[in-house]
Amino acid sequence: MTTLPPLPMTRPKLTALARQKLPCSSRKIPRSQLIKEKDDIDHYLEVNFKGLSKEEVAAYRNSYKKNICVDMLRDGYHKSFTELFALMEQWDALREAARVRSLFWLQKPLEEQPDKLDYFYHYLTRAEDAERKKSFEDVYNNLYALACYFNNPEDKWVRNHFYERCFKIAQLIKIDGGKKEAEAHMHMGLLYEEDGQLLEAAEHYEAFHQLTQGRIWKDETGRSLNLLACESLLRTYRLLSDKMLQNKEYKQAIKILIKASEIAKEGSDKKMEGEASYYLGLAHLAAEEYETALTVLDTYCKISTELDDDLSLGRAYEAIAKVLQSQGNTTEAIKYLKKFVKIARNNFQSLDFVRASTMLGDIYNEKGHYNKASQRFQQAFDTTVELMSMPLMDETKVHYGIAKAHQMMLTVNNYIESADLTSLNYLLSWKESRGDIEPDPVTEEFRGSTVETVSQNSEHLEELSRFPGDQKNET
């Protein structure tokens, strides 16, 4: 969006005079004081400026907003006055509604913002002049300048008003091959997208895309309008597909994402094409179409490798691992997750590292490889401690504790199954002290790798008892 410089304008006579008495005071002045001040001003002007007309005297008395309106009417800009007056009424209505909802409403009244009033006067009157001359491109440019000026959070509704005006005027411009119409569709798409009306946004972005196909048009920053159309359309399609997937409308989501993928290929942007493949692959995964999901995600993997984009490659490995895990192919899933862990570690992506380590720990835990599961969960937990993320810390702490309990369960079960006096003594000793428990040296060779010392386990359990969440319970 264009950032406009300060406006070098020649002000009408009344507003030029009125400007000299700014800034306006927001305090309410008693009527008696106003009458006295009016008399004082009249006397002062009569003594010192005998040549002033009544209109010039009125410029000092009236508000800046009123002088702007008077100048518009005096100069014959009746349409500009009507539009400005309607905007001022809406401005006051919105301020009043916001004041009722919040005691901290800081938006100033329009009469206390002379710069905005100047912009209104300058561009609205120029647009009206251009409209009289049937120069619709100049009308568009002046209205668009106002939209750019009011592109801030508190005035976005004003920006949207001028976007809509630009859209109507753009339909009348026939000399530029449809460029202004394409830009107007882009702005209307943004308007609806920000308002959450995705279907309406998609309609405008589709028209924007159609008008820019085969064109070399660029925006004010030098970016291709066709590429912007592709990006906007893909973003909207993805948001629409997310809603469809939430409602389990898998076929519709896949259909719209296939369309997005085709548009991405037209844009000749490999990164954008890869993103489209990624979301399409996830949609196939949600629909349990695993083979198709693997094929599409493999395309994303190849594009990420070609672009030397490690972070995208990590996302591809994660998604492929989820598909393989859903198929029950945990061995291959582990391979891809290890690659994901390596990329996350090398690129200092802590959240990705936590997620990958947790996924690996879950798989190892399900397979009964409790030592490996415990190691992965511990890595995830240690990383969340560094991140100081309490929700993640609590989640990984639970995973870690479960894996350590499973480790201990193997040793305890073996002692119980032995049913001899020595094993019973070990169990009773541990039960009393909750300290170390050692495997029976006689039966250890038969237990193999499944029998472990729990001295390390108990240390970890004590460590878990010192976690932040448990300290509250002790107190």
Swiss-Prot record:
User: Could you tell me where this protein is found in the cell?
Assistant: Cytoplasm, Cytoskeleton, Flagellum axoneme
Arranged from A to Z, the UniProt key words for this protein are: Cell projection, Cilium, Cytoplasm, Cytoskeleton, Flagellum, Repeat, TPR repeat
Q: What PANTHER family does this protein map onto? A: TETRATRICOPEPTIDE REPEAT PROTEIN 29
Q: Does the keyword Repeat apply?
A: yes
| Protein's organism | Macaca fascicularis (Crab-eating macaque)
Recorded protein name is Tetratricopeptide repeat protein 29
| Superkingdom as given in the UniProt entry | Eukaryota
Query: Which Pfam families does the record cross-reference, listed alphabetically?
Result: TPR_12
**Segments for region (Disordered):** 436-475
Question: What's said on domains?
Answer: The TPR repeats are required for axonemal localization and flagellar beating.
Instruction: Give the source lineage, highest ranks first.
Output: Eukaryota, Metazoa, Chordata, Craniata, Vertebrata
Do the record's keywords include Cytoplasm?
yes
The record, for InterPro entries, names: Bac_ResReg_Asp_Phosphatase, TPR-like_helical_dom_sf, TPR_rpt
Bias type Basic and acidic residues, positions: 459-475
Per the record, the gene is TTC29
Job of this protein: Axonemal protein which is implicated in axonemal and/or peri-axonemal structure assembly and regulates flagellum assembly and beating and therefore sperm motility.
Name the predominant localization.
Answer: cytoplasm
Where the TPR repeats fall, as residue ranges, is 92-131, 136-173, 182-215, 234-267, 274-307, 314-347, 354-387
One BP annotation, GO: cilium movement
State the GO CC annotations. Answer: cytoplasm; cytoskeleton; sperm flagellum
Which SUPFAM superfamilies does this chain map to? TPR-like
